[in-house]
Design a protein with these regions (language model features):
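Long, hydrophobic alpha-helical transmembrane bundles and adjoining juxtamembrane helices/loops
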Residues: 110-133, 159-165, 170-186, 193-197, ...
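B-type heme-binding environments
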Residues: 2-138
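Polar-ligand-bearing catalytic/cofactor-coordination segments
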Residues: 11, 80, 116-117, 129-142, ...
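Cytosol/nucleoplasm-facing, intrinsically disordered, low-complexity tails
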Residues: 1-16, 36, 456-460, 470-473, ...
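Membrane-embedded catalytic scaffold of the fatty acid hydroxylase/desaturase
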Residues: 181-303, 352-449, 462-466, 471
Length: 486
């Protein structure tokens, strides 16, 4: 690697870049980052990145133009001048992994990141440029800061409540049915807190994302914060395949088989996948983030939160079994799993795609997202929806630190919409507008997980096929091995 040339640059404030020792790069894969058609070697900058090295390492050998322009408040002033110090002469097309370093089953067949990832305009006349000016108003800045502080306080209170409820439940002080219902709501709320923390730089609290048995905080940094938010509703959006594996299961078997699949994740699968992530090497379908961090001598504390949460979840399961609370545990597991699964897939209408020719990224995001209403009280809906209720602001301002900040930002967004003649639709009601659409999708005929083409001629063939039985067995086994929706 041509490292020494780039290490001679000066960092922010005139200090030298904190480059890892030359020996640390020996044998490390060549890393490049593409921004606006230009290739850069940001390896010497990894230790200096204000958001920590993880966001950069997960996005290595990709076009990160969208992330640069949307995860920074003023990239023209703060980021683009800095990038010039790390420019490479290598053609950008040679720097991009065709599969973006993610498993192929998460992407459409024949996907090629060079040709299939979208590009957008980022000039001064765009919606995002106007929104940045609105967000810079002192009143808006103060409101967002106060909202973040309130969110953190409330998240801490919910975590304390969770500890109290679990202790009372496992001590047989609290009625099992009451505890189960409380845990379903608290797991959903804590996952909402983790959802916000995953977007924050260097926050171990992102592990709260895993409390609902659906999320996986380590892969969420990439699959959610980078790929989904950057490439919403395009072929590069891995969230569009969230239902993927289960759609190959016959509709009458789908709910119980997917439940067993996720139970396998809880018992062993998440742990297997985490160990795999921490040991895997860089390849076309893997980013090898932890392996590269070890090679470069960078800090490796990112997974402490994951192991703390997952040890807690398994201790709960073990103690519940010893205390004779298995049915109560199973009830809260199934309730948490399916409530949060339906919330995830209800946050976008994946069957109703907008105008893919739209070059204004923020306008496209507005067209492809919707807000959700459960009670009509925005802050309460944040917790009941796992942080998904104020969804339009979340997608337009992915760098914000909390769901409360998204609520506080809504007036600024609406002002820009009004000036541009863009309609601001009211939030969709979860019960009457969203769940019926999700239910139709959930109970659709079995189809190929990747292409979504029908697999059987009719419902009888779908449920009586030996091939279907074999698929169900393999799908459950995949959960035990940590393969599937994580």
């Amino acid at each position: 690697m041509r490292v020494l040339h780039y290490c001679r640059g000066m960092g922010k404030g005139g200090e030298k870049d904190d480059c890892p020792p030359r020996a640390a790069f020996k044998g490390s894969p060549k890393k490049r980052w593409v921004v606006d058609g230009v290739s850069y070697d940001l390896t010497p900058f990894l230790a200096k990145h204000p958001g920590g090295p993880d966001f950069l390492l997960w996005s290595a050998n990709r076009d990160i133009s969208i992330a640069v322009h949307t995860y920074h408040k003023d990239p023209e002033r703060t980021v683009l001048p800095l990038l010039r110090r790390y420019r490479c002469e290598e053609p950008a097309v040679k720097s991009v992994k065709r599969l973006m370093g993610v498993p192929q089953f998460l992407l459409p067949p024949q996907f090629d990141a060079v040709t299939d990832t979208p590009s957008y305009d980022w000039g001064p006349g765009t919606f995002l440029a106007d929104l940045v000016k609105e967000m810079a108003r002192p009143a808006v800045t103060r409101a967002v800061k106060a909202a973040d502080a309130a969110f953190d306080r409330h998240a801490l209170i919910l975590l304390f409540m969770y500890g109290v409820i679990v202790s009372a439940w496992l001590s047989c002080v609290l009625r099992p049915s009451v505890a189960a219902i409380a845990l379903i709501l608290l797991r959903t709320a804590l996952a909402g807190a983790g959802h916000s923390f995953v977007h924050r730089p260097k926050s171990p609290w992102g592990a709260l994302f895993d409390f609902n048995y659906v999320g996986h905080c380590t892969t969420a940094v990439d699959g959610h914060a980078l790929l989904h938010h950057g490439y919403t509703q395009t072929e590069a959006d891995v969230k569009r395949g969230f239902f993927g594996g289960m759609m190959g299961v016959a509709r009458a078997y789908r709910v119980p088989i997917h439940t067993l699949h996720k139970l396998g994740h809880v018992v062993t699968g998440c742990l297997v996948r985490q160990v795999d992530l921490q040991l895997e090497r860089d390849a076309e379908e893997h980013q090898g983030v932890e392996d590269l961090k070890r090679a470069l001598g960078l800090g490796n504390w990112a997974h402490v939160g994951f192991w703390a949460v997952h040890v807690c979840l398994r201790v709960e399961l073990y103690v519940a079994w010893r205390q004779g609370l298995c049915w109560s545990w199973l009830f809260q597991f199934i309730g948490s799993l399916w409530l949060n699964t339906l919330l995830v897939v209800s946050s976008h209408d994946f069957d109703d795609l907008g105008d893919e020719s739209e070059r204004d990224w923020a306008v496209f995001q507005l067209a492809e997202t919707h807000d959700m209403s459960i009670t009509g009280w925005p802050r309460l809906d944040c917790w009941l929806s796992a942080g998904l209720a104020p969804h339009r602001a979340h997608h337009l301002l992915p760098y914000q630190r909390s769901a409360y900040a998204n609520i506080a930002s809504e007036p600024a967004i609406r002002r820009v919409c009004e000036r541009r003649g863009i309609a601001w639709d009211p939030p969709k009601a979860l019960g009457s507008e969203i769940l019926p659409v999700v239910a139709r999708r959930l109970f659709a005929p079995a189809c190929d997980p990747a292409t979504r083409e029908a697999l059987y001629a009719d419902a009888v063939a779908e449920h009586a096929s030996w091939r279907q039985l074999a698929y169900c067995v393999s799908y459950v086994a995949a959960g035990v091995c940590g393969i599937g929706s994580i």
